[in-house]
Design a protein with these regions (language model features):
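ABC ATPase nucleotide-binding domain "signature" loop
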Residues: 15-18, 269-276, 306
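Pre-Walker A adenine-sensing motif
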Residues: 1-4
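Pre-Walker A (Motif I) flank of P-loop NTPase domains
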Residues: 8-11, 261-263
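Conserved ABC ATPase signature
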Residues: 198-201, 208-256, 264-277
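Phosphate-binding glycine-rich loops of NTP-binding sites
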Residues: 9-49, 248-254, 284-285, 300, ...
Length: 371
């Protein structure tokens, strides 16, 4: 219903099932959908099924029925603030409209809406100034920052589907993943594939090569070569890859293609289908990527291997806990239980104690039941 948290270079989001981890990541995707090319407020709300689906089930009349996002950003010596409040339009259309849009730079107000123009023509409130190039010139760094948000949650079954004919642009689940790779400038793509190939040789037994080839219909495919008893490596395409190999390829691509200028990479449970040895080094791999591209990384996880990385501190772990009035978000470092780390407990041990359901006997009863 209401969450407030700081984001540093990295943030690891943990919590039980249905605590809101995906929804928390979606805050950043929502702002990216507004600021991004071809997006906007109406697009961002519609993509999520309407304003009623975006607001918390526990919200009731919280914030007078408004959806409110309030973000503070540091850019060198400058501090920006962007606040957006959205409500449903009164009347038949019930379109999402801007209730408030505020921008400040170093506490100096740059924009406040509604203004006189909005009051004279209320249709203007169906769009934010954030999404309009002609209107966001004075706070373009905010729009650029949100536009660089990238989300990764590759679904191998979607990539393998041979019947796919229509793909969604920038689909985080992978329907256009190989198309995106193929559309990259050849020299850049080949350089990135070489970097990925070296990583995959270390992580996947027998892996030898990775390339993109077009079939007779012009559709691009990932082609991997695997060493075997023959002199030439055997070739497989994405339909033959394991879930883990596909997700690892996607994860490497997401990391390598991030721009050098600051941005945000959102990863949802990146450990899925990956070997525990690979999962264990993911924080180090991501830390290396952050050093080379100056990005913030926010990921949700259930993996103790990730949380127990020696480089992770309690102020990088955001804990979501379910209450009778919605989920509560707190940094692990702010909780008294963090002192258990000084006694030798690992971060995953402390987190498990805080988020584990009180009673799981219902699961055993369900497994034992017979009709």
């Amino acid at each position: 219903k209401n969450v407030e948290f700081d984001v540093g270079e990295r943030l690891f989001v943990v919590g039980p099932n249905a605590a809101g981890k995906s929804n928390l990541l979606d805050i950043f995707r929502f702002l990216s959908d507004i600021a991004g090319q071809g997006g906007g407020l109406a697009f961002a709300i519609k993509r999520r099924g309407g304003l009623a689906k975006v607001r918390s089930l526990f919200a009731r009349n919280n914030a007078r029925g408004r959806l409110v996002v309030d973000v503070k950003l540091r850019d060198g010596e400058d501090t920006w603030r962007y606040r957006l409040s959205v409500k449903g339009e009164r009347g038949g259309q019930n379109r999402p409209v801007v209730d408030e849009e505020l921008v400040t730079k170093n506490d100096r107000e740059i924009l406040r809406r509604p203004d006189d123009r909005d009051r004279k023509d209320e249709v203007l409130l169906t769009q934010t100034h954030l999404e309009q190039i002609a209107s966001n010139q004075r706070f373009r760094p905010i729009a650029d920052y949100f536009d660089r948000v990238q989300y990764f949650h590759l679904v191998p079954q979607i990539i393998r589907d041979p019947s796919r004919t229509l793909v969604a642009n920038d689909d985080p689940f992978g329907s256009d993943f190989i198309v995106q790779m193929n559309a990259t400038a050849p020299r850049t793509r080949d350089a990135w594939l070489r970097r990925m190939r070296e990583a995959l040789r270390a992580a996947v037994p027998g892996f030898d090569s990775l390339s993109i080839e077009l079939d007779p219909a012009g559709k691009p495919h990932l082609i991997a070569g695997y060493k075997n008893w023959r002199s030439a490596p055997s070739k497989q395409n994405e339909a033959d890859f394991s879930d883990g190999t596909l997700r690892l390829i996607g994860l490497l691509w997401a990391i390598i293609k991030m721009p050098a200028n600051p941005g945000v990479l959102l990863l949802e449970e990146p450990e899925l289908s990956l070997n525990s040895a690979i999962v264990k080094i993911l924080p180090s791999v991501l830390a290396q990527a952050r050093r080379s591209s100056d990005l913030q990384i926010i990921l949700s996880t259930h993996a103790p291997e990730i949380l127990n990385d020696e480089g992770i501190s309690p102020d990088e772990v955001l804990l979501l806990r379910v209450t009778d009035d919605g989920s509560r978000a707190e940094l692990l470092s702010s909780l008294p239980d963090a002192s258990d780390l000084d006694l030798g407990l690992t971060i995953s041990d402390v987190v498990d104690d805080l988020i584990a359901p009180d009673d799981l006997t219902g699961l055993f009863k369900a497994a034992r039941s017979r009709r």
